[in-house]
Every structure is written in structure tokens, then in C-alpha cells.
Amino acid sequence: MSAKIIDGKTIAQQVRNEVAEQVKQRLAAGKRAPGLAVVLVGENPASQIYVASKRRACDEVGFLSRSYDLPATTSEAELLALIDRLNADGEIDGILVQLPLPAGIDNVKVLERIHPDKDVDGFHPYNVGRLCQRSPKLRPCTPRGIVTLLERYNIDTYGLNAVVVGASNIVGRPMSMELLLAGCTTTVTHRFTKNLRHHVENADLLIVAVGKPGFIPGDWIKPGAIVVDVGINRLESGKVVGDVEFDAASERAAYITPVPGGVGPMTVATLIQNTLQACEVYHDVQPK
């Protein structure tokens, strides 16, 4: 068996095209373009790359994009004051603060300062709580993007045994909630899990997000499984690989996401979707 590749690049482009068309329709109807503010504190090279891709996506779909590149010496109080201004700004529908933040700034305090209806990353306790209560509003980008991939490939998730490897607040925990909504019997594994192999071998749908290259051996994959690899790891050689041994896993899985070109593009595309949603659901004012 050779797995079918889940092409995140193509699906992400479809999503961006759909959003761009909706933006055109808004402008034709006399409405404003959605606005996204992207805040970067410090000069983390990886963060700069991620932020640049988000800004490019905004330009591509016709959003108003505002960039705030702050020095690493920015205080927590200064960052919170900027968020307060953006919360009150009628042109801004989404506020994204790129993580990680420099030492001395409390991530939790900053993310909770963003108003829930501008929280396009989906990290605010209100939005996480809505997801847990089966009534999601703005959903965390990577999990929502993964669900979109499964939907676009017409993969029926109801009744599947789903296993999430990794329990982070950004991917693993909200992913488990999305999988429950999608009708899966869901297991979350983490660093204290005993006999990880047993759980992986029983997974009809496997989501791996630990940030360790080749962490899941390919021969652990259940034949016919769906494998979603969230990991993005750069080796010393410069090659970018995921958390799953791709070649060996591809021989056993029915579907698999590549790295790069799988989940990564969907995270940015979903951020764009969330910003349009925030604009239309929360902030639209009819033209006079």
C-alpha cells in the first residue's frame, strides 16, 4: 500500500481563493475589507518567517494588514496597551500576537487581553471554552485547519479511533475537542503515557504534534490509517521533516500529510478564515 498524500498546499490555496472572493463581494457591496493586526516582539528568526507568511496571505486575499514590529525590550505594560488600542480599533477584526514572547512577558496575560471576538488564533479561554462546550466560535487555527483537510478529502471521521500524540494548548488539547466534535473516539497521549506504541498501533486517525523529528516509527502505523503530521523540524542538513517517519509510514497508511506542505499552510489559511469570520459575525456595520 502507498498512502494518498493530503496536499495541504493545494487546499490552503483553495481556502485563500474562497476568502479573496468573499472580500471582493464585500467591497462590491460597499463594506470594508477585514483587518488583521500582526504583532511581533523581538527578532526571533522563526517567528519572523511565520509573521511574513501571515502578512503575505493578508495581502493576497485583500485584507487590511497592520504590522507592529516591537523591539525585544518592549515591556509587558507597553504590549498590553497596544492590545487595548487594537481592541478598540474599528478597522481591526483580528489581533495576532506571535509566540513565543520574550522573557519577562506573561504569555497568558497577553493572550487573555485580546478581546475574544478579535482572538483569531483561538487561544482565549472564552474561545477554548466554547469549543469544549460543542459550540465553537473562533477556533484554534491548526486544529481547525486539520479538520478542513479531512473534510476536503471526504474522510469520514465518525466512529474512528483517533489518537493525538502531544497535549499542547496550541494543538493537542484543542485537537482532541475537534475530534470529539467530528465523532471520533479520542485518546490524547503525552510524555507520561505508558506504552505509546500500543495507542499508536490502534489509531485509525493519528495526529502527531510533539516537535521531534521521526518521533513515531513508520512501522507503528496501523495499516489503512490516516496520518496527520503537525511537526516541523529542521535537521542539521537543512532538510525539514515531520514527527513521523514519512517513508515507512507511507507504506502502511491510507492517507498521510507531507512535511512541508501538509498542515503548515492550513494554519495560515485558517487564520485568514477566522479573520473574515470575526469581521462578518462580530464587527460588520452596514454602510449608511
UniProtKB/Swiss-Prot annotation:
The keyword Membrane belongs to this UniProt entry's keyword annotation: no
Binding residue positions for NADP(+): 166-168, 232
Catalytic reaction equation(s): (6R)-5,10-methylene-5,6,7,8-tetrahydrofolate + NADP(+) = (6R)-5,10-methenyltetrahydrofolate + NADPH; (6R)-5,10-methenyltetrahydrofolate + H2O = (6R)-10-formyltetrahydrofolate + H(+)
Keyword annotations: Amino-acid biosynthesis, Histidine biosynthesis, Hydrolase, Methionine biosynthesis, Multifunctional enzyme, NADP, One-carbon metabolism, Oxidoreductase, Purine biosynthesis
Biological process terms in GO annotation: L-histidine biosynthetic process; methionine biosynthetic process; purine nucleotide biosynthetic process; tetrahydrofolate interconversion
Sample GO molecular function, one term: methenyltetrahydrofolate cyclohydrolase activity
Coiled-coil region: none
InterPro entries for the chain: Aminoacid_DH-like_N_sf (IPR046346), NAD(P)-bd_dom_sf (IPR036291), THF_DH/CycHdrlase (IPR000672), THF_DH/CycHdrlase_cat_dom (IPR020630), THF_DH/CycHdrlase_CS (IPR020867), THF_DH/CycHdrlase_NAD-bd_dom (IPR020631)
Superkingdom of origin organism: Bacteria
Protein family membership: Belongs to the tetrahydrofolate dehydrogenase/cyclohydrolase family.
NCBIfam families reported in the protein's UniProt record: PRK10792.1, PRK14186.1
Subunit structure of this chain's protein: Homodimer.
Reported function: Catalyzes the oxidation of 5,10-methylenetetrahydrofolate to 5,10-methenyltetrahydrofolate and then the hydrolysis of 5,10-methenyltetrahydrofolate to 10-formyltetrahydrofolate.
Protein's recorded name: Bifunctional protein FolD
Organism of origin: Serratia proteamaculans (strain 568)
Name of the coding gene: folD
